[in-house]
Amino acid sequence: MDDPDDPRLASGAAWRDLVAALARAEQRVLGPGVPATPRDRAEGFRHLLRFLVAGHLLCVEHADPNAPRFARMVDPAWPWGLDMPDCLYLFAPLRGDAVYRVWGSRGTANHVDFQVNWGHFALGDLSAWGTVASASDLELDFAPDGSFELWLGGSARPRNWLPLAPNAEFLLVRQYFGDWEQERPGDLAIERVGGAAPTPRPRSDEIAARIDRLVTWLDRGGALWERMSRGLVEGMAPNSLVVTRPADSAQRAGLRGQAYGIGNFQCMTEEAVIVRFDPPRCRHWSVSLANWWWESLDFGSRQTSLNFHQAGLDADGVFRGVIAHVDPGVPNWLDTAGHERGTVAIRFLLADEVPKVELERVTLRELAAALPRSTPRISPAERAACLTRRHNAVRHRYRG
């Protein structure tokens, strides 16, 4: 197949544009107002490397809609975009005029959702991507053993089918886990119907376009998450949070039926922040912490998140989590991992109502009096065992 040289690739100009974008990205670590302790700087530059890895996967390596493969869009090794610790995110590129078959086994996750999206996260604009169509495990048919097929595009089918659109760009699969130790991911594969085999070698213009998109990912995509994080940490009152349930529409790329509570925590070493709400009836709820760069905090070796299965409710049915730097000796501890400020993210999926969430900052000396007398205690040995189980569950989810 003919492949005339792309002049920007042949001359190295496209590559130099990428190198220049990496140089510009340092301002997201060294710029004004960014946390500047040695550990923050270390975490910031690690974030840039992680964000580059994520961008390479989404913009370069898994960018061929003619030969799609599922990739982990988010991973503990490359968290970004206020990712949810309960969720395994899978991504596959699409083209709107093709037909695709997704098949495999559902797994045992608490909730599974397939979402066809237009636009791309690299564009750095919330209005630049949205939903073409979606379906969850509540709407799909599965065999008794959990196996299934889902068709994308082409002629309409009565069941297990999602339409595409001319601007469709990718399929996003979300698997929500409640019981991390017992629930297992699905075994999923995707193919373009009628696709060529073997896969042709990439053309020079294709690689140039993918590098250009990676540049956009670094410039515009990275800037978006920084603006949103900075707006929460600096633009809202300390320890405040707002819960919203956006209307499901084609202009929204978030999970259908999910309400989001997003705010900030500010907590010094000798302080704690109590997160309090009355959980609604819903399919799934979770609370998690993130750093300045909107990376979920290390949820594999620390208890930086809790969900409806992991958390305990008090006798009055209220969830009370305790954000603190040191273990306060209560089961619902949310570990700051050394961060004095960051983002709090709360999600309620398919909730019958949206609850009010309160954040209250107290000193560690005041904490016991601020919690119900019946609040259970947890010993250091019990905490260590809990963290070991958590670590093993995360390793199992992301194995391979």
Positions of the model-derived regions?
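A compositional/structural signature for long, glycine/proline-rich flexible linkers
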Residues: 1-400
